[in-house]
């Protein structure tokens, strides 16, 4: 077993896939700050593999949903936050090759870098074997997530569900405010606040775009709202 094989042994076990050419996995985990032989082109292919596979899983799982509803479900499953969550589960950050600047700034834990590396990993599997092998890796990582989707909650995005929940109770609509914005133009990171003034509730969300951060903040606000309403109901 070569040194590179040994470095990726645990990751291969987590993916349930053994690379014949581990150098492909290494490139998938190499950020552009580390080398010109990086994962950007891999990410392009991996994104397509991911989107097709998740779309097919949703199509088979939910025959009753419309194209628009399936699209919203897929968007929630393939967004940066979900990909970063899966990458954390795989401990992908432990295997990244990053330049000195990215290392110092915590790039191994940055959602955008983790999400890109995971997509690039799907591409690496397809280059090492074929599309079917990459599809199986995606399916193994997403089976539980797809199986446990609550379509009554997920068919609409979080901002829409929050707005409808407030309107149903004749409450004021939420106010969103950017708390911080960092990173270079091509890799920005937003922190957003969601203020439910009448309910005295404030939540926050992070994301690679303002929209993604607002969606995460809205999801958190929904949870807080449900908890407060449930507590109020118990007291009455």
From Swiss-Prot:
Keyword Coiled coil applies: no
GO biological process: mRNA processing; regulation of gene expression; rRNA processing; tRNA processing
Cofactors required: Mg(2+)
Molecular function as annotated in GO: double-stranded RNA binding; metal ion binding; ribonuclease III activity; rRNA binding
Pfam families: dsrm, Ribonucleas_3_3
Family, similarity comment: Belongs to the ribonuclease III family.
Job of this protein: Digests double-stranded RNA. Involved in the processing of primary rRNA transcript to yield the immediate precursors to the large and small rRNAs (23S and 16S). Processes some mRNAs, and tRNAs when they are encoded in the rRNA operon. Processes pre-crRNA and tracrRNA of type II CRISPR loci if present in the organism.
Protein name: Ribonuclease 3
